[in-house]
Amino acid sequence: MDAFKRNLEKLAELAIRVGLNLEKGQEVIATAPIEAVDFVRLLAEKAYREGASLFTVIYGDQELARKRLALAPEEGLDKAPAWLYEGMARAFREGAARLAVSGSDPKALEGLPPEKVGRAQKANARAYKPALEAITEFVTNWTIVPFAHPGWARAVFPGLPEEEAVRRLWEAIFQATRADQEDPIAAWEAHNRALHEKVAYLNARRFHALHFKGPGTDLVVGLAEGHLWQGGATATKGGRLCNPNLPTEEVFTAPHRERVEGVVRASRPLALGGTLVEGIFARFERGFAVEVRAEKGEEVLRRLLDTDEGARRLGEVALVPADNPIAKTGLVFFDTLFDENAASHIAFGQAYQENLEGRPSGEAFRKRGGNESLVHVDWMIGSEEMDVDGLYEDGTRTPLMRRGRWVV
């Protein structure tokens, strides 16, 4: 077996054993780009060897999405397969694991009318809500694992022939996920321990807010009452550990939906449903993004933020060191799974229940500052020029990051 096949086998095994931490007899519901069919078959093989009772896959096709946006009647863009998402949500609540294979062409929908793209995305977000709630509530174990989609490879390595670009992207994936190491599972155990140490430190400090200061950014993010930091392996409501993201370098918590003030600029592009959004700037008052601009893709971003009132508020704040393995590649991946783990970031939209003590829901969740929305969109703000302080309620502060690196 050559090195590529060996690393691909290791990645698939990581997804099932470390990402999902699959339980014997558990069902798996997978979503994947249609180009990933061979990788999905390998994932299914690993899942069945670990005792999966049923592996069901739902494929997505960006070419079909593009044809729909170009040819379907306008009123058809308000439709989405609610029946499918309701079924997925029911399966998750009944114990099925959720496996997402990521990887897509970040430019697949470029050139299409932004109002059409936004309309379809809004309809899909509404229909997907039951499934999103089950995921953000951690009712079951779930993970995201990357696939080197040719369109994605072309975006990351635009000067290379496609075959070489795909090979280089796979190498980056194997490195970032630790699949290229001799014992990837042991490497992940050590990595999870390191992330959990940072989580324990931050949870012990009980900061009132975080202050981000860097070029174009002077932002104070208030933290939700009874907030909890998370990172690495996370427990579901039933107590089963899973690693939601392969790779991951972040520790994250819930902002207070009404206590975000200041200005912030993105440090990396955002791939938003087949459209690249670059140069994002936002100004917050009392937690609400009163001004949002982008140098490219602004209309698609605006339409997403018009989904509901919570879409212009923050649901996540994450700290990521600028000297981690993904950041040190020097690559811009045009993929949230990778770029969010190369830089500190914030997210518009839905907050995670796991980031609040006791995992409250409904009015209790909102009362403590948890944000609710149909969307959850991470965008990157960290860099080697970013400083981050933890602020206490009395105004004193503790340096957490200097020039993008941990100092604690």
UniProtKB/Swiss-Prot annotation:
Annotated cofactor note: Binds 2 divalent metal cations per subunit. Can use cobalt, zinc, and possibly also magnesium ions.
Subunit structure: Homodimer.
InterPro entries, per database record: M29_Exopeptidase, M29_N-terminal, Peptidase_M29
UniProt entry tagged with the keyword Zinc: yes
Protein family: Belongs to the peptidase M29 family.
Top EC class of this enzyme: hydrolase
Top-level taxon of the source organism: Bacteria
Protein name (database record): Aminopeptidase T
Positions annotated to bind a divalent metal cation 1: E250, E316, E340, H345
Any GO BP annotation: proteolysis
Signal peptide range: none
Cofactor: Co(2+); Zn(2+); Mg(2+)
EC number(s) given by UniProt: 3.4.11.-
The keyword Protease appears for this protein: yes
Species the sequence originates in: Thermus thermophilus (strain ATCC 27634 / DSM 579 / HB8)
Biological function: Metal-dependent exopeptidase.
Key words of the record: Aminopeptidase, Cobalt, Hydrolase, Metal-binding, Metalloprotease, Protease, Zinc
Pfam family, one: Peptidase_M29
Molecular function (Gene Ontology), one example: aminopeptidase activity
Residues given in the record as a divalent metal cation 2 binding sites: E316, E340, H376, D378
